[in-house]
Structure formats: structure tokens, C-alpha cells
Amino acid sequence: MVSRGPDEWLETIKKCQALTENEMKQLCEMVKELLMEESNIQPVQTPVTVCGDIHGQFHDLLELFRTAGGFPDDINYIFLGDYVDRGYYSLETFTLLMCLKVKYPAKITLVRGNHESRQITQVYGFYEECLNKYGSTTVWKYCCQVFDFLTLAAIIDGKILCVHGGLSPEIRMLDQIRVLSRAQEVPHEGGFSDLLWSDPDNVEAWQVSPRGAGWLFGSKVAREFNHVNGLNLIARAHQLVMEGFKYHFPEKDVVTVWSAPNYCYRCGNVASVMKVDEDLEPTFKIFSAVPDDYIRESTANHNNQRAGYFL
């Protein structure tokens, strides 16, 4: 058989067809090498499109690209993590994003979410999906090695911090993120974990999160963090927003971007991407779920019993 390369892999995965185990090994090695060169806070220039959780909703990811204006050959993208779990095409979703990273390394930034974790993916679907599709856990292990090298944050023109979850009482300055050791499984607590797990909420300062990891943080915390670090905005994902995006706090200095429409194929929400031009004024493009026969068939054929953690 003639060996195929990244261009052929991309054309295959665009059709929602999985790569071979050996191709996945090669792809993951290529992506790891690219990610090793990136900093914990990857600088990105405008114009850029920021995308929230995808959660294995492959056909909706294709709709996201259509909504945003195309693949990264023309547009800079930042994805805020949670590529896998819950949806039925986590493997194909993450494979597509990795193929795009290889083809357009400077045009797409992949931030780590709390689901890019060995522990979480063994509970919420990605581990089981890889086992079912390949007959072994080998490809899952390759992908988990990539997870360990995903960047923790991105910063747009030095003014908009992009992170999966939120802030940490252990992190006051951006430089404290830059010196974290990220090439590891997500810790159970501490600054690294908090970046992936925390949520903005109507609390005075800090409050223990009901998720069991990370913190709830209030408007005063966000305002002080942005002031100290010269930021205009924190863009994050991590929480389902029925309207696709949501500004938090009176200052509108934290925004949630959610990019998985009709989440879990049943929530009925719309999704959004956040476009940021040179003026640093965000605008949002809303899109709905694709009424896809593949998804309906998969939904009917899958056991939808998952553990209780939902958002």
C-alpha cells in the first residue's frame, strides 16, 4: 500500500473517516513536535476567531468552519479545549484539528481543556470510543500524549486572554502561567488545574467550585486580574450557554464562548464563535446544529448512559 501523508489524512478525516493506527501514531508525533515549540500562553495576532467546546460533535465542527468562513488557510483560529467526550465523533474531531494543526501550524492554536485528560476521557467517552473503533487503547494513548503538550492559554494582541476555564487564587500574574510545567496529566488542584476548571460566578471573591475542581471567581477578582496584567477581556469556554455566548459581570470583562450546538444532541442550544479584528472589539457569529443523518443514527445506536458530571 502506498504510504499517505498529512494532505491525504486531512482529506480522509474531512469525510469523517478514521485514519489507520499507524497514521494516528505519525500524526500525533508531528503535532507533539509542533506543540513543544509553543509557550504556555501562546501569542496570537488579530484577526482571529475564538471557538469554545466542541465535545466530539464532528459535523457541527464542520458547520463551525462554514460559519467562520473556512479552514485556517484564510483565518486564524483559537480553540479553547474540550475537543473530546460526550459526542460520538471525538476521535474524528480531534484528528481533524490535529491535521489542521500540521497543515497550518501558525494559523490554529489548540488550548487544553479539562477533558484533555486521561482520567476524564476514561469516564466520559473518548477512551471507550477509541477502544471500539480500533479494538485497543493504543490510539487513545497517542492522543493523551498530545493532550500533555497542548498550550494552557493564548493571548490576542496582548489584550485578550483565552483559556478554557478561568482564574486561580494561585495565579496573579501572567508570568506565573508561563512558568508552569504543562507536559503532564492535569493535576487535581493548583494553578494548572484551576485554569482548566474554574468558572465566573456571582460571588464576592473566591468560592469552592461544585465541580470538585477549580474555583468560582467573582467580578472583583476578574477586574483586578485584568488590571494588573493589562488585559481588556478574558475569553473562556467550559460552560454551556444556551445563547452561544455570554458576558459575565457589569464590566463585561469575562465572556464565555460555547461552540457545541444542541449539546449532547439534546440541549437545544445554539453555538457561537467569537471574531476579533484589529480593533479588539469582539463580534459573535451564531450557528445551529446540523440536522445530520449520521448523528441521528449514532444517537439511536449508542448507549447514552454517562456519569453524572454534565457541564
Swiss-Prot record:
Primary localisation category: cytoplasm
GO cellular component annotations of the record: cytoplasm; nucleus; protein phosphatase type 2A complex; protein serine/threonine phosphatase complex
Gene3D superfamilies named among the record's database cross-references: 3.60.21.10
InterPro entries reported for this sequence: Calcineurin-like_PHP_ApaH (IPR004843), Metallo-depent_PP-like (IPR029052), PPA2-like (IPR047129), Ser/Thr-sp_prot-phosphatase (IPR006186)
Cofactor annotation comment: Binds 2 manganese ions per subunit.
Active site positions, chain numbering: H115 (proton donor)
GO molecular function: metal ion binding; protein serine/threonine phosphatase activity
Location(s), subcellular: Cytoplasm
Keywords, alphabetical: Cell cycle, Cell division, Cytoplasm, Hydrolase, Manganese, Metal-binding, Mitosis, Protein phosphatase
Cofactor: Mn(2+)
Effect of L35A: Reduced interaction with TAP42
Reaction equation(s) it catalyzes: O-phospho-L-seryl-[protein] + H2O = L-seryl-[protein] + phosphate; O-phospho-L-threonyl-[protein] + H2O = L-threonyl-[protein] + phosphate
EC number: 3.1.3.16
Binding site for Mn(2+) 2: D82, N114, H164, H238
Stretches of the chain forming a coiled coil according to its record: none
Any single Pfam family the record assigns to this protein: Metallophos
One of the GO BP terms on file: intracellular signal transduction
Residues the entry annotates as binding Mn(2+) 1: D53, H55, D82
Family: Belongs to the PPP phosphatase family. PP-6 (PP-V) subfamily.
The protein's assembly and partners: Inactivated in a complex with phosphatase methylesterase PPE1 (PP2Ai). Interacts with phosphatase 2A activator RRD1, which can reactivate PP2Ai by dissociating the catalytic subunit from the complex. Forms a ternary complex with RRD1-TAP42.
Function recorded in the entry: Involved in the dephosphorylation of the large subunit of RNA polymerase II. Is required in late G1 for normal G1 cyclin expression, bud initiation and expression of certain genes that are periodically expressed during late G1. Associates with the SAP proteins in a cell cycle-dependent manner.
Miscellaneous comment text of the record: Present with 3970 molecules/cell in log phase SD medium.
Protein name according to UniProt: Serine/threonine-protein phosphatase PP1-1
Native source species: Saccharomyces cerevisiae (strain ATCC 204508 / S288c) (Baker's yeast)
